[in-house]
Curated annotation (Swiss-Prot):
InterPro entries: ATP_synth_OSCP/delta_N_sf, ATPase_OSCP/d_CS, ATPase_OSCP/dsu. The gene is atpH. PANTHER family: ATP SYNTHASE DELTA CHAIN. GO terms for molecular function: proton-transporting ATP synthase activity, rotational mechanism. This is ATP synthase subunit delta. It is a peripheral membrane protein. Keywords: ATP synthesis, CF(1), Hydrogen ion transport, Ion transport, Membrane, Thylakoid, Transport. It comes from Synechococcus sp. (strain RCC307). The lineage of its organism: Bacteria, Bacillati, Cyanobacteriota, Cyanophyceae, Synechococcales. Belongs to the ATPase delta chain family. The keyword Metal-binding does not apply. F-type ATPases have 2 components, F(1) - the catalytic core - and F(0) - the membrane proton channel. F(1) has five subunits: alpha(3), beta(3), gamma(1), delta(1), epsilon(1). CF(0) has four main subunits: a(1), b(1), b'(1) and c(10-14). The alpha and beta chains form an alternating ring which encloses part of the gamma chain. F(1) is attached to F(0) by a central stalk formed by the gamma and epsilon chains, while a peripheral stalk is formed by the delta, b and b' chains. It comes from the Bacteria. Pfam families: OSCP. It is found in: Cellular thylakoid membrane.
Length: 181
């Protein structure tokens, strides 16, 4: 287990335990996804929280003013605890680990889907059903991303299994077939 994961696990596990005891795990998972997205998309926020110039109290006040209206007290307490312990810089690792533990607990399979263009809601629903069938599960969490280099189609990653239904993948396979002939 990498060091960052080792450091993140106790915080993630504690958040999951709090969520389970209060029957808020599902809501906390949704908050974690939204917070992870906000954290990932704001380099300024990351820089400010990692800055040694900003005091711990300053970081906690900033977190409070930024998130107190949009997240639960349990999640806000986690943010403040990470700030207190000088670990706010690893927020993304803690949230990702929390989501892993949550999915494990709920039996949810994570699928990474990369498509050539953004998928409509209807396409996402169809894809979700197909992924459930392939994964042999009733619950799936899909992490969508867009890569125009795929030319067309999509690539699905389920653990170590990769399903390449992209035009780029088909062209590559054709090239390999021709090279062997």
């Amino acid at each position: 287990m990498p060091l960052l994961n080792t450091l993140a696990t106790p915080y993630a596990d504690a958040l999951l335990q709090v969520g389970e005891s209060r029957k808020q795990s599902d809501a906390l998972a949704d908050e974690a996804k939204a917070l992870l997205s906000a954290w990932s998309s704001s380099q300024d926020l990351q820089d400010a929280m990692r800055s040694p110039v900003l005091s711990v109290e300053g970081k906690k006040k900033a977190l409070d003013s930024l998130f107190s209206e949009s997240i639960s007290p349990a999640m806000l307490n986690l943010l403040k605890l990470l700030a207190d312990r000088q670990r706010i810089g690893m927020l993304d690792a803690v949230l990702e680990r929390f989501l892993e533990l949550y999915r494990e607990l709920r039996g949810i399979t994570l699928a990474y889907v990369t498509s050539a263009t953004a998928l409509s809601e209807q396409q996402q629903d169809k894809l979700t059903e197909k992924v459930k069938t392939v994964a042999g599960t009733t619950a799936v969490d899909i992490d969508l991303s867009v890569d125009p280099d795929l030319i067309g189609g999509f690539v699905v990653r389920l653990g170590s299994q990769v399903i390449d239904a992209s035009l780029r993948g088909q062209v590559r396979q054709l090239g390999l077939s021709l090279a062997r002939a």
